[in-house]
């Protein structure tokens, strides 16, 4: 089953992404596969500008920023034991995981 598995992690909190990536790397290394990463991908920032008042004062505005953080992990020489270990792994609820085989 020796194939490459690519895992993308995405979250609005960088600490959750880093802890999840660390957990995955530790689990995969314990299962005996090779790991490349976690590789930090560019942070995507969305900025929203809104008026402070509902009706007047166009010059008075407020900006909000929403940042999403991403990490990439590549797993090489994976076995059935590695896949089982990844399936049993519990990650925090604020992390989106995308897996490509």
UniProtKB/Swiss-Prot annotation:
GO terms for cellular component: ribonucleoprotein complex; ribosome. The keyword Ribosomal protein applies. GO terms for molecular function: structural constituent of ribosome; tRNA binding. Coiled coil: none annotated. SMART domains: Ribosomal_S10. InterPro entries: Ribosomal_uS10, Ribosomal_uS10_CS, Ribosomal_uS10_dom, Ribosomal_uS10_dom_sf. Keywords: Ribonucleoprotein, Ribosomal protein. Signal peptide: none annotated. Pfam families: Ribosomal_S10 (PF00338). One of its GO terms (biological process) is translation. Belongs to the universal ribosomal protein uS10 family. PANTHER family: 30S RIBOSOMAL PROTEIN S10 FAMILY MEMBER. Part of the 30S ribosomal subunit. This is Small ribosomal subunit protein uS10. It comes from Porphyromonas gingivalis (strain ATCC BAA-308 / W83).
